[in-house]
A protein has these predicted regions:
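Helical element adjacent to the flavin cofactor pocket in flavoenzyme catalytic cores
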Residues: 136-176, 188-192
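Dinucleotide-binding Rossmann-like beta1-alpha1 core, especially the glycine-rich loop
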Residues: 46-124
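C-terminal catalytic lobe of FAD-dependent flavoproteins
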Residues: 273, 281-287, 293-378
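Beta1/beta-strand and adjacent pyrophosphate-binding region of the FAD-binding site
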Residues: 1-14, 30
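Short beta-strand to alpha-helix junction loop
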Residues: 61-62, 89-98, 137-156, 300-306, ...
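Flavin-dependent oxidoreductases
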Residues: 186-279
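Glycine-rich FAD pyrophosphate-binding loop
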Residues: 24-43
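Gly/Ala-rich phosphate-binding loop of Rossmann-like dinucleotide-binding domains
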Residues: 19, 23
Length: 378
């Protein structure tokens, strides 16, 4: 029996995850990307694999599965990853109350979390600002990669292990039945075609995307130069604004009180979708962010005012100032507007669109891809 073939369009994290899952299923896989390398949201994020941000049930389980796949891949390649866990710190009574409630909730959900008083936080994470610190909630689940390194090296890994073939600088402009077209007359065919085009709604199926409950999110990011060897975070660290951002926190009974306090004290932050996190890679660089602006089109300029707001808030819990910043940039990712967490469509027979992970691509893609291949594909 002839082996089934699959084409994946897009070499970001969703496309790479689909290529892996299809290969394991037994497909011969080719990946086409319009650029010389992946250069979209997949390389512009924190590199946080973030189960704590996912609600209990299918999404949390998917995040844990994705994390474990990252660990498997890192063990078989030169991709760096580290299960650092995460720390949410509290500097006022409302934040501390929410963290206490989340500890109870997460323990009930059998997550690996631990509530730390201020003394314990400082003993384990001495760079955390001690002034007004009440404590923190540590979760052991979270893992860090350097997205730039990981997304660059994953194609090589997939080729070596699964014989996935990559075709760069190939912009697919049309799909007809089982055939993709590149430029005037270059064509390739496969039994299955999977479109993982990220925030590019305009090239393939633009009429369909125009009807979908999907938009885009622009986020501004910053990264320090390599910090001194004694400047080590030891975990991914988040401030109180992050407690308002993730759906896994929404059931904390005191969250409305914290929301009210933040609205009174940080209305400019909430209006610009800002919450503040920091993650350190193997080069000792610290990635910091971020802002959230929603729409279909954006100005191609960064706002230094927004970057300053992020750094100002960061200094409430970490001693990182403007002088350390080496790079700033923005990323754009697709975001569903109907509350769903992924978009899986089949506009034609044996053609599938996978999109709309809403900024959780690093956290969910590998697990989601396995689920799609198991349940949606022949």
């Amino acid at each position: 029996m002839q082996q089934q073939s699959a084409i994946v369009i897009g070499a970001g994290i969703v496309g790479l995850a689909m290529a892996r899952a299809l290969s394991i299923k037994g497909y011969t896989v080719s990946v086409f990307d319009k650029s010389h390398a992946a250069c979209g949201a997949s390389v512009r994020n924190f590199g946080m694999v973030w189960p704590i941000g996912q609600p209990a049930g299918a999404l949390y389980n998917r995040a844990i599965r994705t994390r474990d796949i990252w660990k498997e891949i890192a063990a078989e390649s030169t991709i760096w990853c580290k299960q650092t866990g995460s720390l949410h710190v509290a500097y006022n009574a409302e934040e501390w109350q929410v963290l206490q409630e989340l500890e109870q909730q997460f323990n009930t959900e059998q997550r690996n979390v631990l509530l730390l008083n201020a003394k314990k936080v400082l003993s384990q994470y001495p760079l955390v600002n001690k002034q007004n610190l009440l404590g923190g909630l540590f979760s052991a689940d979270e893992l860090l990669v350097d997205p730039r390194q990981a997304i660059e090296l994953l194609p090589e890994y997939l080729t070596k292990k699964y014989n996935v073939q990559f075709y760069w600088n190939k912009c697919v402009t049309q799909i007809t039945e089982s055939i993709i077209t590149i430029g005037a007359n270059e064509q390739h065919s496969a039994n299955i075609i999977v479109v993982c085009s990220g925030a590019d709604f305009e090239t393939l199926y633009p009429e369909l995307f125009a009807t979908l409950p999907i938009t885009k999110c622009k986020l501004q990011m910053q990264r320090t130069a390599a910090m001194p060897t004694n400047f080590t975070l030891n975990t991914a660290i988040c401030g109180g604004l992050s407690l308002l951002h993730y759906s896994s926190f929404k059931d904390a009974p005191s969250l409305p009180l914290l929301q009210k306090k933040m609205q009174a004290e940080y209305s400019n932050y909430l209006a610009n979708g800002i919450h503040v996190m920091a993650a350190q890679n193997n080069l000792n660089e610290i990635t910091i962010g971020d802002t959230h602006e929603y729409g279909i089109g954006f100005a191609p300029f960064d706002s230094m005012e927004m970057n300053k707001l992020v750094l100002d808030y960061l200094q409430l819990f970490l001693p990182i100032t403007q002088q350390y910043i080496a790079q700033t940039w923005y990323g754009i990712y697709p975001k569903l507007t109907n509350g769903e967490t992924e978009l899986i469509l089949s506009p034609q027979k044996n053609i599938f669109i996978v999109n709309g992970l809403g900024g959780a691509g690093m956290t969910l893609s590998f697990g989601l891809a396995e689920e799609i291949v198991a349940t949606h594909l022949p």
